[in-house]
Amino acid sequence: LGLVGSEMCIRDRYEEKMYAVGKIPGGFNKREGKASENAILTSRVIDRPMRPLFPKDYRNDVTLNNMVMSVDPECDPEVVAMLGSAIATCISDIPFDGPCAMTQIGMIDGEFIVNPTLAQKAVSDLKLTVASTREKVIMIEAGAKEIPEAKMIDAIYKAHEVNQEIIKFIDSIVAEVGKPKHAYESCAIPEELFAAIKEIVPPAEMEEAVFSDDKQTREENIRVITEKLEEAFADNEEWLAGL
């Protein structure tokens, strides 16, 4: 998964290697082939809680590779993959407002089960995934068989409580082997530039230009506005670079 342009690019790959079980795909789809649906969904589960914790003005590319070679067949590897990604990022020199942790909660006969096995998930009335930081819950993914709202809230609190223990464990690893976070050049656009743009091109005029239904008209409007701003900021190279 990745975003390019004005956003930071994070590539999050979760891949279960075929050669780990002695299979070398051939035929039309050679080698590993494209990512499976499960791999894509797992990558998204990893990406969602972690992406907002990177600095908003950070533009360096970040790649998280989760190559699954061996797993316990009774356990879902997506939780371990997310925790591995979080730990690797926390101990690296990459700026990251972590740690974060993720826990799955099931419910059988009214009792909560932390990180249920696949067999337990098959008969569970609840499939809940919760990611947390120290301060709050940052992601909830859930499916349930009409359980009471109070039970769902209790399950979220339970997962958040478990996540705090995991975060303490991550902190101990960072204290032992963590690297200092490296300095980086902020890509945030100065507030003064925003204010100057609003004076030259009022928000109403900007909205009318960019929300045109016709693509050619929209591109022409943007070109005209860009030329107007470049002319206004001709003496300010730093602001020109931000346009």
Walk through the language-model features, giving the residues of each.
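Short, small-residue-biased leader/transition segments that mark boundaries at the very start
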Residues: 2-4, 8-10
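Stable alpha-helical structural segments in soluble proteins, enriched in small hydrophobic residues
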Residues: 49, 80-92, 155, 162-166, ...
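Structured alpha-helical segments in the cores of large, soluble enzyme domains
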Residues: 12, 42-57, 126-131
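Mobile "lid/hinge" segments at catalytic clefts and subdomain interfaces of large enzymes
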Residues: 93-209
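Noncatalytic alpha-helical scaffolds and linker/capping helices
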Residues: 189-243
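Gly/Ser-rich oxyanion-binding loop with an adjacent helix/lid
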Residues: 61-114
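Flexible, glycine/charged-enriched surface loops at secondary-structure junctions
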Residues: 53-62, 97-99, 166-184, 216, ...
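Glycine- and acidic-rich phosphate- and metal-coordinating loops
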Residues: 25-29, 47, 57-71, 139-141
